[in-house]
A protein has these predicted regions:
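Single conserved hydrophobic/aromatic residue that forms the stacking wall/gate
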Residues: 1-10, 177-180, 184-187
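Active-site loop/lid in soluble adenylation, ligation, and acyl-transfer enzymes
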Residues: 4, 8-65
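Conserved metal-phosphate-binding beta-hairpin within the catalytic cores
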Residues: 36, 116-135
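Short, well-ordered strand-loop elements centered on a beta-strand within folded domains, enriched
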Residues: 46-48, 74, 129-137
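Phosphate-binding core of ATP-grasp and ATP-grasp-like enzymes
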Residues: 54-71, 102-115, 138-143
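Residues forming anionic-ligand binding surfaces in small-molecule and nucleic-acid pockets
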Residues: 60-88
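A long amphipathic alpha-helix within ATP-dependent nucleotide-binding catalytic cores
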Residues: 85-117
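C-terminal helix-cap and adjacent tail motif
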Residues: 137-179
Length: 187
């Protein structure tokens, strides 16, 4: 059931110290980057030779091996298991959390007039082995498009030399500030 709350995903967070700092528990990082995709864009469109903007009937998950020396290659769950990057139970938990986070983020961004195209996640293990979200979720880790115009509101503006990076980020921040008081309903 992907509609459950996300409290179990955030067990790492102890408390917010201020608007820019959060006290968290130490984790050992699972060396998998998880990319959740709702719409074809970026490397997905390039790798599979499809147009950007195709809305998927079901979101997809891609894993890449967090290894700079190897260029963070894409891999599937069988590769992750063979390389002992995670156990079958951990992979299942990571996939479940990723889909649940996706549903919450899509709902939140839609209220802001923004489409969540895709985003990346990183997970870690607490000292007791519990899998938790271990990295930020932000416009820097997400691909966001204006619902009506499909204007890119994320770092693709920089990557593709579209200009207006600061303005797009400011617009995104204004969306989130307008809805910040409502975020509990998505968690």
């Amino acid at each position: 059931d992907r509609s459950r709350g996300l409290g179990d995903v955030y067990k790492r967070q102890v408390k917010e110290l201020d608007s820019r700092q959060t006290l968290v528990k130490k984790v050992s990082i699972v060396p998998l980057e998880v990319i959740v995709r709702n719409i074809s864009a970026g490397s997905f469109a390039k790798h599979y030779g499809v147009e950007e903007g195709i809305v998927f009937e079901h979101p997809t998950i891609e894993f890449s091996y967090k290894n700079d020396a190897l260029g963070d290659p894409l891999l599937n769950t069988y590769h992750a298991l063979a390389l002992k990057l995670a156990t079958p139970e951990e992979i299942k938990t990571i996939e479940d959390y990723s889909f649940r986070i996706n549903e919450a983020l899509k709902a939140f961004w839609l209220t802001c007039g923004v489409t969540l195209v895709d985003f990346k996640l990183e997970f870690g293990r607490l000292s007791d082995g519990t899998i938790v979200l271990a990295d930020e979720i932000s416009p820097d880790t997400s691909r966001l498009w204006d619902v009506k115009t499909h204007e890119k509101l994320d770092k693709d503006r920089f990557r593709r030399d579209l200009g207006g990076v600061e303005e797009a980020y400011a617009e995104t921040v204004s969306y989130t500030h307008l809805r910040a008081h409502e975020t509990d309903q998505y968690l």
